[in-house]
């Protein structure tokens, strides 16, 4: 049985997927999350300035990681690397 992902892992996945721009459906399926989870996390990431919502035409909307989001992703990756190393030490 797989363990549940932490919030930080989900956020990291979303930021990785949105690095080059992605729509809601692509983010949702690639990050393996429900629509309600997507809405919750996407709303938070947009409001905090980690992801921008870009309207490229009607009805096309793309979500792209900001510079601040890229900085957060690097920090998340560092933290996850350290935690993975420590969890493998047992």
List each language-model region with its residue ranges.
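Basic, amphipathic "hinge/linker" alpha-helix immediately C-terminal to the N-terminal HTH DNA-binding motif
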Residues: 58-76
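Amphipathic alpha-helical dimerization/coiled-coil segments
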Residues: 75-90
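Short alpha-helical segments that sit at the start of domains
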Residues: 1-12
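Short amphipathic alpha-helical interaction segments
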Residues: 33-47
């Amino acid at each position: 049985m797989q363990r549940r992902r932490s919030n930080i892992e989900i956020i990291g996945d979303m930021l990785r997927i949105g690095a080059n721009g992605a729509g809601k459906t692509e983010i949702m399926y690639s990050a393996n999350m429900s629509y309600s989870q997507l809405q919750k996390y996407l709303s938070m990431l947009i409001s905090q300035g980690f992801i921008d919502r870009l309207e490229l035409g009607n009805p096309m909307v793309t979500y792209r990681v900001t510079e601040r989001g890229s900085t957060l992703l690097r920090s998340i990756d560092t933290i996850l690397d350290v935690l993975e190393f420590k969890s493998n030490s047992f």
